[in-house]
């Protein structure tokens, strides 16, 4: 996909501990013209959000997509920490659990919920709803 000169690709952080799934969906997003950084757990995601944008890519993230069940720092805790530092960051939660299963604690923190197994078309549609200026 060709970007107009005045539009930079939107930057997405994809957080998923299952490497095959993370890589596959990151590639799908890249094929749609998005820049995608990957993290395999919540701790790594915070490191990328805190330093990656300053050191590696010199650009802020536009969206976070995260699994709910992650090793180390659970997805709910990750969402709370993202909200504390970046209150307007849109977040898509992907999970094999129904949205009511983790409880209301996460409902305040995310913009979209996608049930696993992930339908690629549903993922792209959710991203486009949250990043509407991206064609």
Predicted region positions:
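Short amphipathic alpha-helix used as the core "switch/output" element in two-component signaling
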Residues: 47, 76-87
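Acidic, metal-coordinating helix/loop segments flanking the phosphotransfer/catalytic sites
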Residues: 38-63
